[in-house]
Amino acid sequence: MMRVARRQISCSSVQLALAALLLAGCATVDPYTLPPMSQNLQREDNVGYCARLFADIDRRIDLLGMRDAETHRVAGFPYLRVDRFSAALSPRVATAAQQHAWHSRLRQLDETARAAELTNAALNVDDLPRCRELLGAADAAAAHELRAAAKVPDDYSIGMRTLGLYPLTRLPFAAGIARWHEDTRAVFAMPIDAIPVRGMLHRYSPSGSLREAAPALTVDALGVPVSSAAEQAALLARHAPVLEIDVAGAFDRLGALELDADDRASVDTGAPVAYARIAYTLLGGMVHRQLVYTFWFSERPPASGSTFDLLAGKLDGVIWRVTVDAAGEALVYDSIHACGCYHLFFPTEKVVARSLPATLDESLFSPQALPNLLPNERVVLRIESGTHYLQRVLTAADKGSSIDTVYDLKAERTLTMLARPGGGTRSAYGEDGLIAGSERSERWFFWPMGIESAGQMRQWGRHATAFVGRRHFDDPLLFDAYFELRR
């Protein structure tokens, strides 16, 4: 009897411990409970009013489920937000000018996120910009605490990895990744004409003519390139790729994301679009711009002849990124799918891959290098039908927008404020940064690797790109770990 009781107590204790571990992995700190914001809330002056205004707005945003997941509110400073690039800049802050530039970046991140949240929640609060400035001035003496708090949690769950016996289960995953590497190398080694075609090859070309992009001639106090909206648009237009897609069905056609009557994201293939943004990375001691293009498809259909495909599901996205130098010329290309999967690197002659130690963790995988682009050339991406896997990256003379189908460039942040059929707006992404309805069956088998809902389409800033190890697509230190500039 005593043994049974002890066994029951032991099992209950284990269950409680595991539950606590999962909860701990999901727990987030209320940014209003820490100083200086917790102290500001107690004040009876304008600072106190502003602190309570932000708290009230955030409470309403959370109740309505409109929180934007791209960036993170800073604990103790919830009128500011941080992303991985801003967090990586923190150690550079040494002077008053650098502190001002860094604080301005965090302030701008909050302004951008709140613009979407307030629009989607149909809230109009005129005092927020003034209050953000006032709170920033009131908290100026807490600059050291701000830098310590401006951190971004990674997108891996310790609890899931612990429950999934990650040290053991990662072994078959690592073997599977090695097989994928072999298969991918084999495809990239094929003569281009030998790559199988299921349907018909169709090219999507960016709108507008090829233009030389003016280099960013100035940087801010932190070394971040400063360029006008027109210069950014020219740079994005210059490096926008041509897509050569094996089209075997509607699921292989590019389109614009829109919301249906149930607020679920779908793809309008009558409006081909690339969603673009500019990001930043650190390489060779300098900050470099990154041009990011996201292309959406309506689905990844089940493999031909398959009755059950773990990887199939609604929506599929391909992300293409170009890291450029100060003159606006490509250094490295890389790509993932919008789930964070299939991370491939395509270095140019301007960089050299570092010698990395052998490890089980996913690391630099480059099935192909690329030459430097000539002034009249564009990159062409060959994409497989159904899976939308990259099969080859080519360079070819630009033919303008006179071939096949033209796609437009649109700001990627517009996806956080899509029009609803019944009026108003809503983000394509949930508060968890995932697109509802794009779940994959693989999530039931891949969870021991610690990634929430593996295979599901997700928002910028939420792409974990390694099942084995830890890696994020927007990690600004990633390229410096993998490459060095050729001398």
Regions found by a protein language model. Give the residues of each.
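Bacterial N-terminal signal peptides that target proteins for export
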Residues: 2-16
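Intrinsically disordered/low-complexity terminal segments and short unstructured peptides
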Residues: 8-12, 27, 322
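C-terminal motif of bacterial Sec signal peptides marking the signal peptidase cleavage site
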Residues: 23-25
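Domain-length functional cores that host ligand/cofactor binding and catalytic or interaction surfaces
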Residues: 29-211, 312-316, 326-487
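Extended, regular secondary-structure scaffolds
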Residues: 163-265, 304
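Short N-terminal edge-element motif at the start of the domain
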Residues: 250-333
